[in-house]
Amino acid sequence: MTIVNLAAYHFVSLDTNEQWRPLVTARCNELGLRGTILLAPEGINLFIAGTREAADAFIAYLRHDPLFEGKFATLQFKESLSDSQPFRRMLVRLKREIITMKKPAIKPELGRAPFVDAQTLKTWLDRGHDDTGRPVVMLDTRNAFEVDVGTFDDALDYRIDKFSEFPEVIDANRADLEGKTVVSFCTGGIRCEKAAIHMKEIGIENVYQLEGGILKYFEEVGGAHYHGDCFVFDYRTALNPQLQPTENVTCFACRAVVTPEAQQSPSFVPGQSCPACAPAASAA
């Protein structure tokens, strides 16, 4: 059976999440869906999977059910297909933030951050500057281990271990961004959108988010100005610029990405260890 995987997020002010939670949970269970839906005062973030019919019914439910008062009417979903159900159960969780930055929740009613689409960004990178002549700086908002799998050429990478470190590293490296056009990017858009909003709020000018993240860029223009693959948080581990799964795998023990080369190491034992964690395991 073919399973449809849905991913979506939307920054929008929500104040009835506690009432929604049991109703959304019940509807997902009725449809046989599995995955996780996060509800927070700043919006919604979801990763769910089910049959084609269930996925279509859920999309219609969020967009059109009077319960949601039109707040998700424009919600855009990313879809992918798999041969099996990637999730074990269905969870609807209430959170303080839909992506943790440990800063006061953003104010969605003030509008989303400015964005640049993939084709425009490629044009800027082709010529080395934006439409006004300012140099373009690509700012990677992902964790260091994700960046190591692949990133844009000459991107700024501050080697963060978690997204909540982002505000601190931006404060410390603000001079890198002054006088330039800054394009924040991430896998699918949620982190780079919140990062761009934060930078705007602290007074950094000429900040954009990459619309749809790296995966949308791959879909529209391929791998131009990008080297490597894109790490994804599911069973595929990484996708190449053609959006095909690669031979990278995730270590069961430490969650590190193991490249095909590293898989040749004696330290790589599927389900047990990899070159990143084997020394620590043997020392213990």
From Swiss-Prot:
The active site is at 186 (cysteine persulfide intermediate). PROSITE patterns: RHODANESE_3. Its EC number is 1.14.-.-. Keywords: Oxidoreductase, tRNA processing. It comes from the Bacteria. Residues 132-226 form the Rhodanese domain. Belongs to the TrhO family. This is tRNA uridine(34) hydroxylase. It comes from Burkholderia lata (strain ATCC 17760 / DSM 23089 / LMG 22485 / NCIMB 9086 / R18194 / 383).
